[in-house]
């Protein structure tokens, strides 16, 4: 009988084996529930599995157990805040939002309204994110800096593997609404 695939747990085991980041015990179900309730999102299934198996606590890894609320809120807001920065300073505008308002404050208000409706992204490490959402897994990991969005790994396991192993660019296609439309 073939073992059931557990991509998040496999990624956690791989990260632990690499020994490149300090690890704390994984998050309990109660801790995950508290985080999801406090910040109004749900982890993707593989991300939840990963964090239940281990909690990376090194530089750039969000410490979901000990980081302050403000720190975690900032990390969760960064993708949207980056897009708003690009709207204000780099003339970014998504075609699906309709015509761009002439006044900047109106453009920012409209963009913020639209961005409140796009899928939420959850930090994995540094500027790399996975989409939120229970009953989902296997999404490519996205690197996001303002409106500069790239697929950096085919999935969470591939991301962990790439931390120490140079590899060709992933051939995965981003799978999350809005954010996928702006992958370069």
Task: Name these PLM-found stretches.
Residues 1-116, 122, 126:
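A surface-exposed partner-binding patch
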Residues 114-117, 135-137:
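A generic structural signal for short, non-catalytic loop/turn and secondary-structure boundary residues
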Residues 35, 134-135:
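A short acidic (Asp/Glu
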Residues 126, 131-133:
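Acidic, serine/threonine- and proline-rich low-complexity regulatory tracts
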Residues 49-51, 132, 150-152:
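Residues in flexible loops and secondary-structure boundaries
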Residues 136-183:
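Glycine-rich, aromatic-bearing surface loops/beta-hairpins
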């Amino acid at each position: 009988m073939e073992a059931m695939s557990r991509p998040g747990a496999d990624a956690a085991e791989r990260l632990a084996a690499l020994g490149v980041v300090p690890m704390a015990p994984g998050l309990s179900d109660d801790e995950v529930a508290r985080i999801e309730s406090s910040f109004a999102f749900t982890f993707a299934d593989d991300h939840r599995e990963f964090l239940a198996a281990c909690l990376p606590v090194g530089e750039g890894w969000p410490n979901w157990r000990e980081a302050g609320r403000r720190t975690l809120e900032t990390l969760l807001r960064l993708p949207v805040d980056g897009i708003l920065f690009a709207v204000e300073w780099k003339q970014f505008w998504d075609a699906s939002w309709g015509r761009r308002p002439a006044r900047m404050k109106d453009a920012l208000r409209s963009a913020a309204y639209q961005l409140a409706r796009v899928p939420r992204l959850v930090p994995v490490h540094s500027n790399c994110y996975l989409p939120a959402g229970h009953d989902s897994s296997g999404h490519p990991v996205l690197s996001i800096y303002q409106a500069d969005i790239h697929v950096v790994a085919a999935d969470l396991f591939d991301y962990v593997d790439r931390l120490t192993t140079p590899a060709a660019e992933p051939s995965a296609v981003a799978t999350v609404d809005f954010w996928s439309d702006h992958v370069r």
